[in-house]
């Protein structure tokens, strides 16, 4: 059967079945979670700033604080709605600013802290104490600290969330294999911000967000909706503009990976990416519409559970008109490939996967509807035996 005859009815039948369910699953976010409102947004922004100005800062809690800041921008009511719509049973803790007394170096001092169940007052005080040390050092070096270098600069929280936007696009792998790419991108896009803040260490901040998203999956729902809301709001600071660009790339990646993945899942014995290239335009349109219906956030969940599909979707397609496009072109597994792989690790992993499929006799070349030229290109890549191939 030629690939052009393959239809996606199985996908839509499944979707129809799922959409007729009369019941919903309720998940729990835990005993009690912090959901801050707008009124503590400034304080959470300052907490982010304190971490950013601290040299060699401990970023263990940066991801959590960043998510609390994101929720404070959404507001308590909208955050609760997002979680409940996602099927979570929420026991919400209100967050206020209180005065906390703590002994520091033998002297009792007053601090303003937030009433958080996820972050003790002692941890908050320690963040402030360490930041004060770095701030004093900055005063000695600069004489006067310019507003954009201070811990209360209004864009501190958004700087931290830019790292989160980079991380969320890499959750598909199911591990932290995308960390190197996150660091490289952050060093490039946030170059000015890294120069401003000595405590902005992309690797440590990224690991903190990985930890948060892995440990508390409900934060993924919150962050996706926050990202959409933030990116759709006109105006804002330079960093807000950077965030919007990073997030929309991640959001789009979720839809792209879902699109290729749905199509690949519906076609048996065919290299995942190749199916999308060889399918009729009508089918591709169907998948676009299906992805749009589910939304980008659904894409994140799909790729999280289908890393093979995401593996074959992550690189760009440098030459969409090449013969077989090396299974979604950017990877160059089979067929003509023009250009250098953008990600050598992905290329090698995908090629190894292709070779493994061939060794197991899984690839059915006759289904691929190949021309003589395409078949020759495959021979150059995987050296199949003549009796393995049917035209």
From Swiss-Prot:
Subunit details: Homomultimerizes to form the nucleocapsid. Interacts with the phosphoprotein P. When in a monomeric RNA-free form, interacts with the phosphoprotein (via N-terminus). Interacts with protein M2-1; this interaction allows the association of nucleocapsid with the matrix protein.
Role, per record: Encapsidates the viral RNA genome by forming a left-handed helical nucleocapsid that protects the RNA from nucleases. RNA replication depends on the availability of soluble nucleoprotein. The encapsidated genomic RNA is termed the NC and serves as template for transcription and replication.
Q: Where is this region: Interaction with the phosphoprotein?
A: 244-290, 338-364
GO (cellular component) term, any one: ribonucleoprotein complex
Name the Gene Ontology biological process terms. symbiont-mediated suppression of host innate immune response; symbiont-mediated suppression of host PKR/eIFalpha signaling; symbiont-mediated suppression of host type I interferon-mediated signaling pathway
Tell me the protein's name. Answer: Nucleoprotein
Family from the record: Belongs to the paramyxoviruses nucleocapsid family.
Predominantly, its location class is: virion
Listed InterPro entries: Pneumo_ncap
- MF term (GO), any: RNA binding
Alphabetical keyword list? Capsid protein, Helical capsid protein, Host cytoplasm, Host-virus interaction, Inhibition of host innate immune response by virus, Inhibition of host interferon signaling pathway by virus, Inhibition of host PKR by virus, Interferon antiviral system evasion, Ribonucleoprotein, RNA-binding, Viral immunoevasion, Viral nucleoprotein, Virion
Please name the Pfam families in this protein's record: Pneumo_ncap
Presence of the UniProt keyword Ribonucleoprotein in the record:
yes
- Coiled coil (residue ranges): none
Cell compartments where the protein resides: Virion; Host cytoplasm
